C-alpha cells in the first residue's frame, strides 16, 4: 500500500502502475476539504516511488466524484478573501503536482465527474469513460466559476469556444458528447473500464501514446490568433449577456477570465482564475444560489424520509379532467403510476386526454421518448365517466372546479366508492382543507395536494395538512408527489396555504400602487428587469387569469379580513367587470395574439389606461426603488407571518416554495435569504416609509425582535479557517 486515507487509497495494480481509488465511506465520493488534503498526501507519496511508471485514477462508487462538498461552500465564502486566495493556491498546487508527475496519468471515469471531480480528471493526461459517464463544470449554476483549474485546462484541451459553452451553461456532457468534444479519449464498457485503462496507460508508458505533448499543450497559452480570440470572446460575451443577463455575473466572469488568460501559460492563467473565483464568492448571488442548492437538499431529504415511511403508490385516480386534470394524469402516468381520469362530461375527458397527448407529442418531437413509450403512457391513462375500478386506487386527486360546495360534494361522493385505506387529496389553490374535510367520514385520510399550472413544468407541489390529517397520509402524498417528479413541501392549512397566501398581498401592493398613480407597464418592467421576477404583476395576473384572481382575492379577503379585505373597488375589479380576463380571452392588462408557434404574444393595449383610470384619480412618477419596495413589502410581511404561525416549517422551505412555486428570483435566494442579505434593520427602515399605506405594510413584531437581537433567519455559516492542503 502506497497510501491509505479515509476517502482514498493508492496501491500498485500492476508492477509500475499505481492505482488511486476514491472510496469515501458514504454513497458517493465528494472532493471535500478532507479528501483534497488526502489527494495531496497521496501525490506526495507517489513522488517518492522510484519504480513508478504510470498512475491510474478511479472510483469504487457508481460515480467518479460528484463534485465538491457544497455544504462547505458558505463557510469557505466567509473566510477573509486573502485566506481563501491562499488556500486556492494550495489546492491548485495539488492538481499541478498531479499534472506534473513525471509519468503518464489516466482517469477511469464512471458516472458523474462534476465540478472538482472534472477538474481533477482534467489534470491527468488521458481520460477513459464508460457509457454511464457524465462530465461537466456546473459551478456557474451556483454563482461561481471553476476554481481548481477548470477554466484554464478545459479551453487548452478542447478549444475556447466549446469550453466556454461547457462552463457557462454548467450542463454536464454525456460520455458520447464528451468524446466528440475531446473532453475524454474513449468510451468503453463498464466491465472493461479498468483493464482498458491499464492497457492505455501501458501504451503511454511504452511510447505509443504521446502523453508529454498533451501535457505541454495544457500548460501552454491557447492556440489562437489575436483576431480569432477577439471574434471568439466577443461572440461569447454577447451571447452570455443575452442568456444570463446582469443578475447572474458568473458566466460572464468565467468568459472574461478565459479571455484575459488566453495568452498566458498555466500558472499565470491560474492566477487570473483565482482572482475571479474569489471575487464571485463574495457576491450575494453566489450565496443565494448555493443557499438554494442546500435548501433543495433539505426539502429532498424530508421527502426521502417520507418515502421510507410509506408504501409506494401503484395506482391513482384524478377527478375532473380538462387541462389541469389532464396535466396531473399525464405527470402521474409518465412517471410510471397508472391513473384513472374520471369526469362527468365526455368533452372534459377528451380535453384531458388531448392535453396528455399534446405533452407526449412534444417529447416525441424532441426525441425525448419513443413512440412505444408514448403509447405506453397514454394507455396507462384510463378516461371514464363512472367510478369503475376506483375502489382499487391508492390515492384519488380531486381537481374539479374551485368551488367549496362542489368540491365537498365530490369528495363525499368518492369517499363512498374507494377502499377505507385510500387517500383523498384536493387540488385546491385557496380553499381551506379543514373546511373540505367536514364532508368526509375519514378526514385523517384527506389532505391538500396543490399543483401549479402548467403541471408538467412547475416543480412545486404544496402538500397541505388539515386539522385531522394523519402523518401517514402526509408521508404517502409526499412520496407520491416525489414519484411524479415533483418537489413536495408540506404546509399547514389556512386560506391560500403558503404560496397563494403570500401572493395576494403582492397583488394588493400592485393595486394600491396603481391607485396612487403608478404606471402598470413601468411596474412590470421594474419587477422583471430590476428585481428579477420572470413576469411583472400585470403580466402575471393576465397569465393566472383575472377572473381566477378576482375569485381567489375574495376567498383571501374572507380568510384574512384584517389585511386582505379591500377598501373599495380596485384594478382587479375594474378589469374583471370589463371582461378582461387575460390570456384566456385575449385581453387583460395587455392584448394577446397568437404567434407562429401557437403561443400567446403580449401586446400593448391602449384601452387599458382608461380602465385603470376608473380606480385612480392621479398619475405620479415612481423610482425603481419605490416600486420594488411597495410591491415586495406586503409579500415579505406575509411570508414572515406564515413562518411565525407555523404554516411553513422553516425559512429554507419557504424560500424553496417561493422559487419553485412563484419564480422568485433565484439570484436573491428567496425572501429570507434576501432579508439576511440586505439586513433586517435595512428592511425595517424601508418598510417604515410605507406603513401608512395600510395593514399589509405593517411589519410583524417577530422581525423587529430579530433585528433588535442582531439575528438572521439563516444560521451563520460554520466558521472555517483556510484548510491546509
Curated annotation (Swiss-Prot):
EC number: 4.2.1.17, 5.1.2.3, 5.3.3.8, 1.1.1.35
A single Gene Ontology CC term: fatty acid beta-oxidation multienzyme complex
GO biological process, one term: fatty acid beta-oxidation
Record's catalysed reaction(s): a (3S)-3-hydroxyacyl-CoA + NAD(+) = a 3-oxoacyl-CoA + NADH + H(+); a (3S)-3-hydroxyacyl-CoA = a (2E)-enoyl-CoA + H2O; a 4-saturated-(3S)-3-hydroxyacyl-CoA = a (3E)-enoyl-CoA + H2O; (3S)-3-hydroxybutanoyl-CoA = (3R)-3-hydroxybutanoyl-CoA
Active-site residues per Swiss-Prot or TrEMBL entry: 450 (for 3-hydroxyacyl-coa dehydrogenase activity)
Span list, region Enoyl-CoA hydratase/isomerase: 1-189
Region spans: 3-hydroxyacyl-CoA dehydrogenase: 311-725
CDD domains noted in UniProt: crotonase-like
Gene Ontology MF terms: 3-hydroxybutyryl-CoA epimerase activity; delta(3)-delta(2)-enoyl-CoA isomerase activity; enoyl-CoA hydratase activity; long-chain-3-hydroxyacyl-CoA dehydrogenase activity; NAD+ binding
Binding site for substrate: 296, 500, 660
Binding site for NAD(+): 324, 343, 400-402, 407, 429, 453
PANTHER family cross-referenced by the UniProt entry: TRIFUNCTIONAL ENZYME SUBUNIT ALPHA, TRIFUNCTIONAL ENZYME SUBUNIT ALPHA, MITOCHONDRIAL
Assembly behavior: Heterotetramer of two alpha chains (FadB) and two beta chains (FadA).
Family: In the N-terminal section; belongs to the enoyl-CoA hydratase/isomerase family.
HAMAP family attached to this UniProt entry: FadB
UniProt function note: Involved in the aerobic and anaerobic degradation of long-chain fatty acids via beta-oxidation cycle. Catalyzes the formation of 3-oxoacyl-CoA from enoyl-CoA via L-3-hydroxyacyl-CoA. It can also use D-3-hydroxyacyl-CoA and cis-3-enoyl-CoA as substrate.
UniProt-recorded name of the protein: Fatty acid oxidation complex subunit alpha
